[in-house]
């Protein structure tokens, strides 16, 4: 349980730090620097990447994978994926409304209307892609042989989504880090819970 606890503590530290002048100044400096490196072709690439963390993309993806699990009589795992995604979305919404951090205002390339901390797309990506990787490795033998690579791919996708949020001007770096910490926290909780259920069934 040390990983979820560490991630939760990291999130709490970030939530407090974003109200300090030093962190806010650093966030703004990075966001301004991101604007300076923009290129038309990169704008399109980052806009495409950011959709990988959108709920409108991830929910159908989870439903499709969940349907496949149901077909192969892995109903519990499919339901667990939906449950963790729902928890992810609810937790993010509640925290944004509670913390009420205003988004950066440095020529954003996409429109967002909710509050900024923690980043929802980053939280989605850091939670959902590792969870998908976990269940794919669990049920597909040919992927279980390449477990490390599957998790690396999931991690790379999450990191790219986080970078895209800063590049597009809709989040500060600390928003992304906050989203990552909570997303990974949920992943480790789901993984640990599923492994305990598995051990219980084997008794």
From Swiss-Prot:
Annotated segments matching region Phosphatase sequence motif III: 164-175
EC number(s) given by UniProt: 3.1.3.27
Phosphatase sequence motif I: annotated segments: 96-104
Region (Phosphatase sequence motif II): 118-121
Chain ranges on the Extracellular side, renumbered to this chain: 18-55, 100-119, 168-172
TM region(s), chain numbering: 2-17, 56-74, 79-99, 120-139, 147-167, 173-196
Pfam families per UniProt: PAP2 (PF01569)
Site for Stabilizes the active site histidine for nucleophilic attack, residues: 175
The family this protein is said to belong to: Belongs to the PA-phosphatase related phosphoesterase family.
Role noted for this protein: Catalyzes the dephosphorylation of phosphatidylglycerophosphate (PGP) to phosphatidylglycerol. Also has undecaprenyl pyrophosphate phosphatase activity, required for the biosynthesis of the lipid carrier undecaprenyl phosphate.
UniProt-recorded name of the protein: Phosphatidylglycerophosphatase B
